[in-house]
């Protein structure tokens, strides 16, 4: 069982909730919402006050380049991934846009390529799409590299149209060839 926590704001899931859920299954986090705070009618980027408590109970995290820098203070993706792992995260996925992504798991880095889209229509939801693909593959028992490649291929298909991801597994496999 995997609990994927994709919060909208930094206080959606307390450290206590995450700790409790971690006793019931694996915890996956998309860091984006933890780095936002609403003041009045405006949304502000913030550091994540409870990050160390929550990451200690996190199995998988997905961050992009900006998020990893806010959380760790580091600009190098590999160094940031190592820092997140040091804080307790078992699988660190860092998405790097058109440069692909890296995954750090069990002390090893996996370099995941980005697949070139036919055209870029809309990038909205690509992070969520990556998380969904990666988590689905891992739940099927696939390895880190294959899961990352599948997730990257899903993102390529997502870039090519607006709206939620609505392609098939066969569509994704065609991109991966």
What do these predicted regions represent?
Residues 1, 56, 87:
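Structured loop/turn residues at beta-strand edges in well-structured enzyme cores
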Residues 6-82, 100:
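Conserved beta-alpha-beta core of the PfkB/ribokinase-like small-molecule kinase fold
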Residues 20, 44-53, 77-177:
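Conserved phosphate-binding/catalytic region of the ribokinase-like
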């Amino acid at each position: 069982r995997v609990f994927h926590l994709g919060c909208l704001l930094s206080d959606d899931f307390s450290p206590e909730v995450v700790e409790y859920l971690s006793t019931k299954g694996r915890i996956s986090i998309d860091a984006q919402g933890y780095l936002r705070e609403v003041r009045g009618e405006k949304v502000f980027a913030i550091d994540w006050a409870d990050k160390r408590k929550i990451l200690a109970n996190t199995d998988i995290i997905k961050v992009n380049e900006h998020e990893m820098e806010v959380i760790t203070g580091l600009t190098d993706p590999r160094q940031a991934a190592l820092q997140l792992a040091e804080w307790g995260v078992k699988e660190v996925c860092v998405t790097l846009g058109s440069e692909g992504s890296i995954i750090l798991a069990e002390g090893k880095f996996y370099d995941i390529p980005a697949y070139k889209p036919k055209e870029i229509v809309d990038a909205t939801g690509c992070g969520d799409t990556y998380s969904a693909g990666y988590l689905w593959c891992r739940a099927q028992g696939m390895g880190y590299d294959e899961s990352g490649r599948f997730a990257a291929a899903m993102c390529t298909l997502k870039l090519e149209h607006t709206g939620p991801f609505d392609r098939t597994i066969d569509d994704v496999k065609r991109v991966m060839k």
